[in-house]
Amino acid sequence: MAGRNLVGPEADALDLGAVFRALADEHRRSVMTELAADRSDSERGCNSFNLPISKQTQTHHFRVLREAGLIDEIDYGNRKGIRLRRAAIEKRFPGLLTLLGAESPGGTAPR
């Protein structure tokens, strides 16, 4: 069954303030760090992230990431998949994903 793509703004329209607001939350940053580490950029199910929050809160966080232009969501009706917008992010903000990869799993940059 083909899903309906829910996409954020075009690469040239990505706003640094919106991106920083999206990445300010530790749960969203954790999702982005996991996605950035997977160089295959394959689609992942929203439930594949080990987030200690409710489904409703997860839905909110994925929407914030999508609206900031960091991920695409694919709506299959009874589930959603997400995919990192690596090319768009690297085009607009080169090095941002590398910075995310430098963050340790505990949520702070290594010293």
Please state what every model-predicted region is.
Residues 25, 61, 94:
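Conserved acidic functional residues
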Residues 45, 57, 102-104:
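Juxtamembrane helix-loop transition sites at the ends of transmembrane segments
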Residues 18-22, 26-54, 76-88:
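N-terminal helix-turn-helix DNA-binding core of bacterial DNA-binding proteins
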Residues 66-76:
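A short, conserved structural fragment
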Residues 1-17, 33-38, 75, 85-111:
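Amphipathic alpha-helical dimerization/coiled-coil segments
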Residues 47-68:
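Canonical helix-turn-helix DNA-binding module
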